[in-house]
Amino acid sequence: MTNLPEARELMVERQIAGRSIGDPNVLAAMRRVPREEFVPAHLREFAYDDTPLPIAEQQTISQPYIVARMIEAAQLRPGDRVLEIGTGSGYAAAIAAAIAAHVDTVERHAALAQSARETLARLGIDNVTVHTGDGTHGLPEGAPYDAIFASAGGPHVPRAWREQLALGGRLIMPVGHERYHQRLVKVVRRTEHDYDERTLGAVMFVPLIGDDGWPAEDVMLDPPAVADSPTQHARAPDDL
């Protein structure tokens, strides 16, 4: 039987710190949050493998390394208010919540949203609010946000997300014109109308579905075989 606490520590040492993640807050969060609580029971022994894992609704829990990369790139700080698009199991929200003051997270699948609420409550994580809806609209009632990150890839950065960033806010999102192949981009809001954008690396995420993302009817019902492989949330370059 896998020793899960020991496996978690090895994951942080080898997959996270060992691959150039240096933010001490991110490393502490990855050590603190039990990933096994966010995966299906029959996959718990694989919780700390360097791979995404399938959950429900043809979605996945992201590869630990890419979660750490995205959150490090978002430069989260204590006191930050964060918006996540694509709750999934709730794992990335839990990691962000271990650093930031509060996390709003939006999930379009009601069953996934409810499961994430229950998991977060069971773990005593009380600074995450899970919302159900079209994440491409963001969450206007909670804006502005110090950081926004998306766990799904779209054809472009939704306008609402840019508008809901605070001045100095950071946005991390997979963007690409192919549904399962994207580049991870970082957007920083400099002034009311000026944004900096740069590419951090190549990634593969499930599609962002919504009014300002991919139309649901155009997305394949069954993701490609790679979707549940270690490259589903690709191993981004170490210079991210």
Question: Where would I find each of the regions flagged by the language model?
Answer:
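Conserved nucleotide-cofactor-binding alpha/beta core module
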Residues: 75-195
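Long, low-complexity, intrinsically disordered segments
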Residues: 230-240
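Class I SAM-dependent transferase core
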Residues: 1-87, 91-95, 99, 112-129, ...
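Intrinsically disordered, low-complexity regions enriched for glutamine and histidine
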Residues: 61, 82, 107, 230-231
